[in-house]
């Protein structure tokens, strides 16, 4: 797999709580220059970012982030607001308290409500795999499939661990047809990126891959 093909799977991400507009601009410029799938940024920057890229790049943002335990109504509002401001893709965090209570029906209904507001915009569902048992992850693969969401996503990048090869393998085995996989958190090398893609991920959430590619380009004058 060529580097350009890897870059097409990347949601180039900056979700730091202290992210400044110049830092967001750099993310947007790099994402456009390297033709990544999207730039994933805080919701407060979506409107300004959408105006800045002027249709040249998909803008992704997060809702219910990073803990997921805001109410469904709050998440629905966040979704509507983000789309109104120009977001093309939404990454939502599920309520893990519902998961731990065994209330998967409530998790599914919340995703359905948010997907209804997304309409033709892409919805990715963050399940925070580092906090799940294997059995919970398998159950959530079914929940996300039935909900109509477009992607199941491993991690926020703000919890105890990010994506693992094992979790992506489980997702690839148990998620239904039509649901794609996004691996996110801790992807720090091109080799890891290739492995995640080989295991079934079609999106990668990372802030590091472009830095690596830039370093390689400096050495070889190409990527």
Curated annotation (Swiss-Prot):
One of its GO terms (molecular function) is deoxyribose-phosphate aldolase activity. It is found in: Cytoplasm. Gene3D superfamilies: Aldolase class I (3.20.20.70). One of its GO terms (biological process) is 2-deoxyribose 1-phosphate catabolic process. It is an enzyme of class 4 (lyase). Pathway: Carbohydrate degradation; 2-deoxy-D-ribose 1-phosphate degradation; D-glyceraldehyde 3-phosphate and acetaldehyde from 2-deoxy-alpha-D-ribose 1-phosphate: step 2/2. GO terms for cellular component: cytoplasm. The active site is at residues 91, 153, 182. It catalyses: 2-deoxy-D-ribose 5-phosphate = D-glyceraldehyde 3-phosphate + acetaldehyde. InterPro entries: Aldolase_TIM, DeoC, DeoC/FbaB/LacD_aldolase, DeoC_typeI. SUPFAM superfamilies: Aldolase. The keyword Hydrolase does not apply. Catalyzes a reversible aldol reaction between acetaldehyde and D-glyceraldehyde 3-phosphate to generate 2-deoxy-D-ribose 5-phosphate. PANTHER family: DEOXYRIBOSE-PHOSPHATE ALDOLASE (PTHR10889:SF1). Belongs to the DeoC/FbaB aldolase family. DeoC type 1 subfamily. This is Deoxyribose-phosphate aldolase. The gene is deoC.
């Amino acid at each position: 797999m060529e580097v350009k093909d890897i870059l097409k799977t990347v949601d180039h991400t900056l979700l730091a709580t202290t992210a400044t507009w110049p830092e967001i601009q750099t993310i947007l410029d790099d994402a456009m220059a390297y033709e990544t799938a999207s730039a994933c940024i805080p919701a407060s920057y979506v409107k300004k970012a959408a105006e800045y890229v002027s249709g040249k790049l998909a803008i992704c943002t997060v809702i219910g982030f990073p803990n997921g335990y805001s109410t469904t109504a709050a998440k629905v509002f966040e979704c509507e607001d983000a789309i109104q401001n120009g977001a093309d893709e939404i990454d939502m965090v599920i309520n893990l308290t519902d998961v731990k209570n065994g209330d998967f029906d409530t998790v599914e209904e919340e995703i359905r409500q948010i997907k209804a507001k997304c309409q033709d915009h892409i919805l990715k569902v963050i399940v925070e795999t580092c906090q799940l048992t294997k059995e919970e992850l398998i159950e959530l693969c079914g929940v996300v499939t039935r909900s109509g969401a477009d992607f199941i996503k491993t991690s926020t990048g703000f919890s105890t661990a990010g994506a693992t090869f094992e979790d992506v393998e489980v997702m690839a085995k148990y998620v239904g047809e039509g649901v794609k996989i996004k691996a996110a958190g801790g992807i720090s090398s091109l080799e890891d990126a290739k492995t995640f893609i080989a295991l079934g991920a079609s999106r990668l959430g990372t802030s590091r891959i472009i830095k690596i590619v830039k370093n390689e380009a400096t050495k070889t004058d190409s990527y």
